[in-house]
Amino acid sequence: MDEKLALLRTVPLFVGLDDDELKVVGALTTEVDKPTGSELAREETFGSEFYMIIDGSVRIHRAGATLRTLGPGDFLGEIALIDHGRRTASATAETDCRLLVLGHREFHSLLDAQPDIRVHVLEALARRVRQLTPEHEV
């Protein structure tokens, strides 16, 4: 659990949560291993998982073009936690990966059960959206 807590402390959605709150989040995550070449997300398909990379690298790509490569401490799929919407890009394991996964259902049960966490996470998501779409702000 210590390694899981250490990773969760670095994820912007959870930065600032205390250890007890992080333990609640950690209890809802699942650790998974994905071999090289595994598809984590496919562009234009509906998503419901948020991935946090423990080890390995993940290539983010759209229409075959690499957008960026993510590594340990990075995360992807945070918007799927909110809206179950279509993925805006694909994600493929470039190397063997070890990940923490938080599903849509678990995320919403967390927000329902922990109002303090809900406010913190929603503020963090708003910051993330602003970072991703600065040209659309009013």
Locate predicted features:
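Regulatory nucleotide-sensing modules
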Residues: 5, 9-63
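ATP/adenylate-binding site constellation spanning eukaryotic-like Ser/Thr protein kinases
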Residues: 19, 55, 72-75, 96, ...
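Short, conserved catalytic or interaction motifs in soluble domains
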Residues: 72, 81-84
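Short beta-strand-to-loop transition segments that serve as allosteric relay/switch motifs
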Residues: 62-65, 96, 104-107
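Short beta-strand His + acidic residue motifs that chelate non-heme Fe in jelly-roll/DSBH
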Residues: 60-61, 78-79, 89-93, 109
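Helix-loop-beta junctions that constitute the ligand-sensing/allosteric loops
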Residues: 30, 84-90, 96-99
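Short acidic-glycine-tyrosine-enriched beta hairpin
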Residues: 65-77
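A small-molecule sensor/coupling module
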Residues: 4, 20-24, 86-88, 104-138
